[in-house]
Amino acid sequence: MTSAKTASAPDSFFTASLDQADPEIAAAIKGELGRQRHEVELIASENIVSRAVLEAQGSVMTNKYAEGYPGARYYGGCEWVDVAENLAIDRAKKLFGAGFANVQPNSGSQMNQAVFLALLQPGDTFMGLDLAAGGHLTHGSPVNMSGKWFKAAHYTVRREDQIIDMDAVQKQAEEIKPKLIVAGGSAYSRAWDFKRFREIADSVGAYLLVDMAHFAGLVAGGVHASPVPYAHVTTTTTHKSLRGPRGGLILSNDETLAKKLNSAIFPGLQGGPLMHVIAAKAVAFGEALRPDFKVYAKNVVENAKALAEAMKSHGFDIVSGGTDNHLMLVDLRPKGLKGNVSEKALVRAAITCNKNGIPFDPEKPFVTSGLRLGTPAATTRGFGVAEFQQVGGMIAEVLNAIAQSDDGKAPLVEAAIKERVKALTDRFPIYQ
């Protein structure tokens, strides 16, 4: 018979550090910390959270199951997680001027799935921005649930300027009569005309969903128009430019949709919410309500414009000619380069970004003709216009070197840039 002593947790269970309990994972985390400290992070969907967010997400809230919503749980002992979730809800509503907020989505994909579950039936028609023009997988890609379970029709950008043609969107909506129109994307650098999108949706009897996952932090900071007054439903991730933990958020000012949206998340898609993540969301929303976040959002946009201009000054083409938000797409075709090769070269030089398709891209998704660059993470660590101008120059040096790879100088250039990146990042330390 097993004794109580041997059946219980080991003596070190509540006291051992991660180094002691699992040195392999501890080493991986230390390696990732070193990477983040000494690389320039330009992936537009990534950011650097505060120590307070890290602490909340690594808290004892992870132990608690809390199916349901505050005040209506299926488990006892939820009094403190109710406090955390109510704070997250109230702060999200205040931050975005919304009457309703659901803070439980585990991810951006699940928040959008929930809206589809609440508003559509399988086989219904909806419209979204084409992935190749800067949209997102969950906006109707044929490899995604949204494109498999529903009839997706895509609007796109004009070939001549790579900007959405709203008259074409109107005409397409009138022709196909979608039940839902999605505005938002993952690689579109220009402002969205939410008022016009709502007018188009109303004219054909459609719901308007705005997925502001990429630019929500700019909305919160007052440097980007808010979709909340126009959309029937607004969704966003809580990381990216909002600088919180990875997760999702659903907002609405339409009281008639609140119950449907709540039911779509639970019990429709999810069971017990991740209460440690919700606590961290509350912390991040609180941070975004402070005056300094407005300064941050302003700097993100200024830095993006500076980086775009720096790239142009070094002879690179920027899709649509520039940016109105936190990201840009670099068209590599004039340099004879591919996105996958360019991404790897920059990673070797300690500059992290991602290959990305550009509008009407002739290359396959794992090759691409473009790079996506974003400024939220490096802005968080303190980079300003001067630093992003330097970064633009370093990117150009690396890419020009691999474009002339036959001279054998590319590895030397990459190594030299890596040293310059370390000197730059050492001036802006994180998590000391």
Curated annotation (Swiss-Prot):
Task: Name positions with the PTM N6-(pyridoxal phosphate)lysine.
Answer: K240
The record lists the catalysed reaction(s) as:
(6R)-5,10-methylene-5,6,7,8-tetrahydrofolate + glycine + H2O = (6S)-5,6,7,8-tetrahydrofolate + L-serine
The Gene Ontology biological process annotation of the record reads: glycine biosynthetic process from serine; tetrahydrofolate interconversion; tetrahydrofolate metabolic process
A Pfam family (short name) is SHMT
Q: Could you tell me the keywords of this UniProt record?
A: Amino-acid biosynthesis, Cytoplasm, One-carbon metabolism, Pyridoxal phosphate, Transferase
Q: What is its main location?
A: cytoplasm
Q: Which cofactor does it need?
A: pyridoxal 5'-phosphate
Q: Which InterPro entries match?
A: PyrdxlP-dep_Trfase (IPR015424), PyrdxlP-dep_Trfase_major (IPR015421), PyrdxlP-dep_Trfase_small (IPR015422), Ser_HO-MeTrfase (IPR001085), Ser_HO-MeTrfase-like (IPR049943), Ser_HO-MeTrfase_PLP_BS (IPR019798), SHMT-like_dom (IPR039429)
Query: What GO molecular functions are on record for this protein?
Result: glycine hydroxymethyltransferase activity; pyridoxal phosphate binding
Q: What is its EC number?
A: 2.1.2.1
Q: Where does (6S)-5,6,7,8-tetrahydrofolate bind?
A: L131, G135, H136, L137
Q: Superkingdom, according to UniProt?
A: Bacteria
Extract the Gene3D superfamilies matched here.
Answer: Aspartate Aminotransferase, domain 1, Type I PLP-dependent aspartate aminotransferase-like (Major domain)
Could you tell me where this protein is found in the cell? Cytoplasm
Give the protein family: Belongs to the SHMT family.
Q: Oligomeric state and partners? A: Homodimer.
What job does the chain carry out? Catalyzes the reversible interconversion of serine and glycine with tetrahydrofolate (THF) serving as the one-carbon carrier. This reaction serves as the major source of one-carbon groups required for the biosynthesis of purines, thymidylate, methionine, and other important biomolecules. Also exhibits THF-independent aldolase activity toward beta-hydroxyamino acids, producing glycine and aldehydes, via a retro-aldol mechanism.
What this protein is called in its record is Serine hydroxymethyltransferase
Gene label: glyA
